[in-house]
Every structure is written in C-alpha cells, then in structure tokens.
C-alpha cells in the first residue's frame, strides 16, 4: 500500500475519520460522509482503507533487535478483571532499569504500541505495555475488531488493570522502583488518570493527546507531567484550558506542548495522520523527561 500523509486528505475527511475512530460514528456513517470525496474513480471504501493503520510501517525497532529482550507477561489484577497480560521489553545489557508503562489507544495492544515499548528499551528503560483487552481475549490482530472489543470492557475495571500493571512493574526486581507512564489517545487519558490514582508512586506521566481528569482530582497528582497535544485536535484540546487552570491552582509541575498543524494521533507512524517532525520532537522531549525524572 502506498504511504499517504495527512496533506493528501482534506481536513474535513480527517476529522470525519477521527469521529469514526473514537466511536462517535460507525463505519457506515463514515463511508456515507466520505462519498463526497470519492472522485476520479476513487471509492469511499478505498478512502477508508487508505486511512487505516498499516502495521508493516510500525517497526522502528525490529522484534529481533539485539539491543532488546522481550517477553509476554501476565499480571494479577484483583480489583480489575482478574488478570492483564502484556508485552515486556527491556535492554539486553544491564540488570536494573527505571520502568515505563506504555498504554495503548482504544484498539488494544497493537504492533505500534509494542514497537514503542522496544523504543523505550533501547533508551535504557524496562517497558511494559499491557493489553486492556485481555479480559475479552486480547488484541484480535485487527483494529476494527479491537475497537469493538474495547467497547465491551468495563472502563473502571480496565483502569484498575492498568494500575495493577504499573504497580507490578514498579515492584519488579529488575526495576529501580521509579516508574513513569506514557499513553496515546485513550492511553493518554489513562496516563492522566494514573497520575491521579497513583500519587507519589508514579514519578512521571506523559499523555499524548489524552483526555483530562476532573479538575477536582488534579490535587492528587504528585508526578510531573509532560503533555503533548495536536494543534488540529479540537475534541481533546477543548478540555485543556480547564485542566491547565487546575494544574496551576494545585501547583502541579507540568510542561505542555501544542504541535501546530498536526492531527490527533500524530505519533502513530502506521497511519496518514502521522507527522514525522512533530512525532520525533515529542519523542525526544519524552525521553529527556523520563531521563530527568526517572534516572
């Protein structure tokens, strides 16, 4: 499949796809809305396929990269769904590292998120990417089916699963005991939520274009935050002014960056919404932030 960029699509069409991805409209409604852009022999179905992720593009760090060791792990989650499984990536050299929990989007633990875990491992972190779909069989290998399963999982229990995964990572003998979290889309919201739920047990949180916690809960945040937003992401950005006001009122340490002219999901290098310049800058800032706060 030819790789396309956001600039290859009208912004109205990208906004329509964003509504579909987040469950505000179904596939049929997207296809109906996309018909107006289907010209020159291009069909709405072809447009849909061109916007979907292509995981052949996700492997910045190959699975067999000699710098990284990976395995599957399952964590007990008595307050959640009982257990949560995930993907553990750690440096091949050394014996103890700071930990980073990697939280997926609203489709489950797909190859992009596994690659993010490996990217952290080559930066000398032990990274664990849990699969919030564990209780319904795990990520099914397809994002559309993953989205359907995602809607079936109790959200509070899933959140407790991520808390359990974070505490498990923190307690591992090969972790220094200092952990952070990075999350994308839904996972960005979970990164904010873990900052609230875990208090001083969390040492750093990096939400990428994630939903914000209630203002009343912000006082519970003890970890410093590095917050990334996409300039064209009106849906998520609408909650930022109130969140920032609460962070300031409660003297929470934070840095926030808005990457102008890019879309929600700009870090995900498997879709046309990926923006290489913004993604690389945000990731550089993320690694520097984790080195500062977890080292």
Segments and roles (model prediction):
Residues 1-29:
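N-terminal secretory signal peptides
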Residues 18, 27-53:
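N-terminal export signals
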Residues 57-94:
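N-terminal cap/lid segment of alpha/beta-hydrolase-fold proteins
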Residues 96-105:
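Short beta-strand element of the alpha/beta-hydrolase
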Residues 107, 133-156, 265-270:
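Cap/lid segment of the alpha/beta-hydrolase catalytic domain
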Residues 143-182, 293-294:
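Gly/Ser-rich "nucleophile elbow"/oxyanion-hole loop immediately N-terminal to the catalytic nucleophile
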Residues 163-222:
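Primarily recognizes the serine-hydrolase "nucleophile elbow" in alpha/beta-hydrolase
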Residues 227-229:
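Short beta-strand/loop motif that positions the catalytic acidic residue
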